[in-house]
Amino acid sequence: VKRISIVVPVYNEEDNIAHFARSIAGVMAALPYDYELLFVDDGSRDGSREILLELGAADRHVQSIFLARNAGHQIALTCGIDHADGDAVITMDGDMQHPPELLPELIKKWEEGFEIVQTVRLTTEGVSLLKRLTSKYYYRLLNALSDVEIQEGGSDFRLMDRKAVLALRRYREHARFIRGIVGSMGFRKTIVEFVAHERFAGQSKFSLHKMISFALDGILAYSVQPLRAAFYVGMLSALFSVLLFLHVLFETMRGETVPGWSTIVVCCAFFGGMQMMMLGICGEYIARILQEVKNRPLYLIAQDNRQGAAKEEEV
């Protein structure tokens, strides 16, 4: 019997976990597969831990790993992928926005021979127009800058064959953007569209700061265009300076005095701001290089509650 691993990162989701686990159990009971439901607790501070332990004691399919600290959604997802042992691995969120009823369709596509089955969100129920527009234009900007095409409306709700999972595990960068990594790997893939539901309960734990950091990771991990933009802006600035110098020289040769204090102040402020912005772009890339060369572990496991887990992995 083939085995399906369902990897679910959670952070302070005590109101959603039990309902989500019941929904998965109902869907998988109708399918001819063994499965594991692997939760990765990303340092939750509510009652998520206790609920996961209770679910694991009552249902052999429910497994859980507890990270030593809040490492972020992408790292928690990576931990789950690293420890999933199924013939296929499905990654999804546990707030019911990724519909469990779509799992049979993903598995069907996998059985047809596709090694990556990527879902694409058509829309999200209850989401503001502003958030829809920012998401839409972010993906357009990302695709314009990046060498890897990221499907607009793409998410981390996907199925991967064991072969693709083993390939993904070889990517160990710290500033992780798994959508980009999966998009760059190749393999035979297909798309399944869906409408994302509203959250079953609670509020999104993805703050504005986390969303901005995630967006920057996506752009900087797969594009050098910001660095090239800095070069082009520098060239234009130099050209502007040469033209301004020629103008002043020409007027001086004509015996005219060029009034320029306000112009000088504006130019200094403008170019000073541009220089700081370009230094910031370079700094972002350098900071990521520093993060990689330290070669620190991506995550630390406080408790591995899977059946037969190697306890020496815990800290």
List each model region and its residues:
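Hydrophobic helical membrane-anchoring modules
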Residues: 1, 177-315
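Structured catalytic core of nucleotide-sugar glycosyltransferases
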Residues: 1-128
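Residue-level signature of catalytic and energy-coupling elements of molecular machines
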Residues: 6, 24, 80, 95, ...
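Short conserved micro-motifs on helix faces and helix-strand junctions that flank
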Residues: 9, 67-69, 158, 231, ...
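Residues in soluble alpha-helical coiled-coils and helical-bundle/repeat scaffolds
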Residues: 12-15, 97, 101, 169, ...
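Conserved amphipathic alpha-helical interaction elements at protein-protein interfaces in regulatory
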Residues: 26, 30, 54, 58, ...
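Acceptor/aglycone-binding surface of glycosyltransferases and processive sugar-polymer synthases
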Residues: 63-83, 100-181, 197-216
